[in-house]
């Protein structure tokens, strides 16, 4: 007991010392003739540590059970132990939690309806990687007004994920950095590493430590090798810098993630055809990896036309009916209202990439369920 008190006391003393050193360094820097630190930084704000949100919004037993089961089910799909089709479907990005919950309520009905053929997981993306500039997502700018209330954005993201899981809808998301997973990764059943970050060393290291299965997209130019290399890298242990739940800088040592797979999202040309799928599976086998892969119905595979997602789904369905067993999943961008808008004026419509509407969503899921039913029929 005394030893613990001494440790706590020493920790507090160190904090005071470090704070004093920092203030002294700041004062010195401000009076330097040639300042070299934080020259282009306008402001630094304190971020609430992950533990603050985890304490306020703790995971429930129901949510934990759903996440645990869904992760194992997806891992079984990746390793060929389950013959259902994983469907990652939902808005391109979340900007309105109310609309997201209405979408989830509708999707939950279809999740139960097709549970024997499809494993439906809602796409719940809070962060948007940008080629240049633009709205970066609910976490970065939750009020959509350029105030960048990130503390509120992180809380809103966790609150939505908790509600979704409590109602029985598992969630998926894209991971963009090394810090935000500490705030809500316990509520995620499947994660994605995007085409712009698959080749990044830190994202491969991050994936090696995530508790959920992870999909790596091929590069924006269609390069599949970088995704295959990423899977191999993520399966091994790594050390990298991140933060603890208490918000302190830390060295993270991972154990490696054996449940990663490729996502074919197209490049200069679409890559979802029978020939592309077979070629990708052969390359995965040659690399000593599972040949199971996912097809992204959007992005370059749809030639950035949301209406063509149905064409991709129809092609995938035909492959399933013909016995193609290496397609373990699809990804679809879908919302309550089809299309997109620049400002959030239409309820249930995307403000980032255009999505298919709800009627098409129902039609597509029925198509995929029927195709997979035929694929697994004796």
Label each PLM-derived region with a short phrase.
Residues 31-37, 117-272, 276-277, 299-300, ...:
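Active-site-facing alpha/beta catalytic cores
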Residues 41-78:
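N- or domain-start disorder-to-order transition segments that initiate the globular core
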Residues 86-96, 353:
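Conserved phosphate/anionic-ligand binding catalytic regions in large, soluble enzymes, centered on
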Residues 90, 295, 357:
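Conserved, mostly hydrophobic/aromatic
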Residues 94-112, 147-159, 314:
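Glycine-rich anion/phosphate-binding loops
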Residues 333-374:
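Internal helix-turn-beta structural module
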């Amino acid at each position: 007991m005394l030893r613990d008190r001494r440790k706590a006391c020493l920790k507090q003393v160190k904090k005071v010392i470090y704070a004093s050193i920092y203030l002294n360094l700041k004062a010195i820097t401000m009076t330097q003739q040639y300042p070299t630190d934080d020259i282009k930084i306008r402001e630094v704000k304190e971020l609430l540590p992950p533990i603050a949100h985890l304490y306020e919004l703790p995971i429930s037993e129901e949510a934990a059970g759903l996440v645990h089961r869904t992760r194992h089910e997806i891992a079984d799909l990746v390793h060929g132990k389950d013959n259902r089709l994983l469907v990652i479907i939902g808005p391109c990005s979340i900007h309105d939690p109310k609309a997201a919950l209405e979408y989830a309520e509708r999707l939950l009905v279809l999740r139960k309806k097709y549970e024997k053929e499809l494993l439906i997981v809602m796409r719940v993306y809070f962060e948007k990687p940008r080629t240049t500039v633009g709205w970066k997502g609910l976490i970065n700018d939750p009020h959509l007004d350029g105030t960048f209330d990130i503390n509120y954005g992180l809380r809103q993201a966790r609150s939505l994920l908790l509600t979704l899981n409590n109602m029985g809808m598992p969630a998926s998301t894209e991971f963009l950095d090394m810090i935000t997973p500490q705030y809500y990764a316990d509520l995620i059943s499947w994660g994605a590493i995007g085409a712009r970050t698959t080749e990044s060393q830190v994202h491969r290291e991050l994936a090696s430590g995530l508790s959920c299965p992870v999909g790596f997209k091929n590069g924006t130019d269609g390069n599949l090798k970088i995704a295959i290399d990423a899977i191999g890298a993520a399966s091994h242990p790594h050390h990298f810098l991140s933060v603890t739940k208490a918000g302190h800088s830390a060295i993270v040592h991972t154990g490696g993630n054996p449940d990663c797979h490729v996502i074919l999202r197209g490049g200069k040309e679409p890559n979802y055809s029978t020939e592309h799928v077979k070629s990708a599976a052969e390359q995965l086998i040659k690399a000593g990896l599972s040949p199971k892969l996912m097809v992204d119905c959007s992005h370059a595979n749809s030639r950035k036309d949301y209406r063509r997602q149905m064409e991709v789904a129809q092609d995938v369905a035909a492959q399933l009916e013909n016995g193609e067993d290496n397609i373990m999943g699809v990804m679809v961008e879908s919302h309550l209202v089809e299309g997109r808008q620049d400002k959030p004026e239409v309820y249930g419509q995307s403000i980032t990439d255009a999505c298919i509407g709800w009627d098409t969503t129902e039609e597509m899921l029925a198509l995929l369920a029927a195709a997979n039913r035929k694929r697994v029929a004796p």
